[in-house]
Regions:
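Surface-exposed loop and turn segments in beta-propeller and other repeat-based domains
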Residues: 60-62, 105-119, 163-167, 211-224, ...
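Residue-level detector of Asp-centered blade-edge/turn motifs that repeat once per structural unit
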Residues: 20-23, 73-77, 131-132, 181-183, ...
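Short glycine/acidic-enriched loop and turn motifs that connect beta-strands
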Residues: 31-37, 86-89, 143-145, 193-195, ...
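Asp-box/WD-like beta-propeller blade repeats and closely related beta-sheet repeat scaffolds
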Residues: 54-126
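Loop/turn-rich, solvent-exposed surfaces of beta-rich toroidal or solenoidal domains
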Residues: 227-293
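Short loop/turn segments immediately following beta-strands, especially the blade-tip
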Residues: 1, 46-53, 92-102, 149-158, ...
Length: 329
């Protein structure tokens, strides 16, 4: 079941959120084009009351680009990095001992374009750290690239890897990304052509190599107007991969070959609502929460531990325009 335990914390256009490894702090991007009276978006740090779940604001910083839409915390808990969608840039910040954010320690502007009308400029859409805390991957929808950067968490710095990127299929539009828990594979979901890409990953140098491209729709179906993908996560066991389809209103389920990293289609499960911009898998791997942005609900699904298939529990709770979830362990 899902039970609300804390009230609403007001913030300017909060979207993606992440919890610090200590469980003491939460960070949220402010997806705006003006923040604290200056151009661009922002990022805000909160302290978490572990007993009540209540959030107390610590501080905010500028994102140094319009409409930040994603962020990650490095595995040591020393820095945060974010992706600015409209601004086409990324920025990093050091985390203080009290959980507050420094001013930006690194700002990198992307430049490039591709073939779709939405790809006339760079659009950094997600940023994720690998399991060894050495590299981050940035999906850029506008450039049709997944870029990799070497991470210096202590200093809050990012530097291009060698090679610095892997190309997507032209017009694919890389959106979100997930590393496999065993470290040798990674996966990206492509917003514009409704596909998933499986990658081989060399964590020694941060290199990605495409292995497979597979549809996020049921076999035989093709993209219709108004459809696009959104979120992607690997199951904690590493056995399954999940992605969400907006417009189609489903979660796609794949099984992951543990030797090759390639994907086998399992099913598309309806989300009992519309526009699943995001979802979350609880740390035990038993449940998935689908966030239906257009219908203002969160739907709870049970995960089959043998097949990865989803079963609706019958539980949906109201939530205004849900777009991101993070679990407090």
């Amino acid at each position: 079941t899902l039970t609300r335990i804390a009230g609403v914390t007001k913030s300017a256009e909060p979207s993606f959120v992440a919890v610090h490894p200590s469980g003491k702090y939460l960070y949220a991007v402010n997806e705006t084009s003006e923040f604290m009276g200056k151009p661009g978006g922002g990022i805000t740090a909160y302290a978490i009351d572990r007993l009540t779940g209540t959030l107390t604001k610590l501080n905010s910083q500028l994102s140094h680009g319009d409409h930040p839409c994603h962020l990650m915390i490095d595995r040591s808990g020393r820095c945060v990095a974010l992706a600015n969608y409209t601004g086409g840039s990324i920025a990093a910040y050091k985390i203080g001992k009290d959980g507050s954010l420094s001013e930006a320690t690194c700002i990198i502007q992307h430049s490039g374009s591709s073939i779709d009308p939405r790809q006339q400029s760079a659009h950094a859409h997600s940023i994720d750290v690998d399991l060894n805390n050495r590299f981050v991957a940035v999906s850029d929808l506008g450039m049709d690239q997944v870029l990799t950067y070497r991470l210096n968490a202590r200093k809050g710095l990012l530097n291009p890897a060698d090679p610095p990127f892997v190309k997507a299929v032209p017009g694919a539009g890389p959106r979100h990304f997930a590393f496999h828990p065993q470290g040798a594979f990674a996966f990206g979901i492509n917003e514009l052509d409704l596909t998933t890409t499986a990658y081989a990953y060399d964590g020694r140098v941060g290199k990605l190599q495409s292995l497979q491209v597979i549809s996020t729709l049921p076999p035989g179906e093709t993209k219709q107007a108004g459809q696009s993908t959104a979120e992607m996560y690997v199951h904690p066991s590493g056995k399954f991969l999940y992605g969400s389809n907006r417009g189609h209103h489903t979660i796609v389920v794949y099984q992951i070959d543990q030797q090759t990293g390639k994907l086998t289609y399992v099913e598309n499960e309806g989300t009992h609502g519309e526009t699943p911009r995001s979802f979350g898998i609880d740390p035990t791997g038993r449940f998935l929460l689908a966030l239906n942005q257009s219908t203002n609900t969160i739907a709870l699904f049970r995960i089959n531990q043998d097949t990865g298939a989803l079963e609706y529990t019958g539980t949906s709770v109201p939530c205004p325009a849900p777009v991101a979830t993070a679990f407090l362990r």
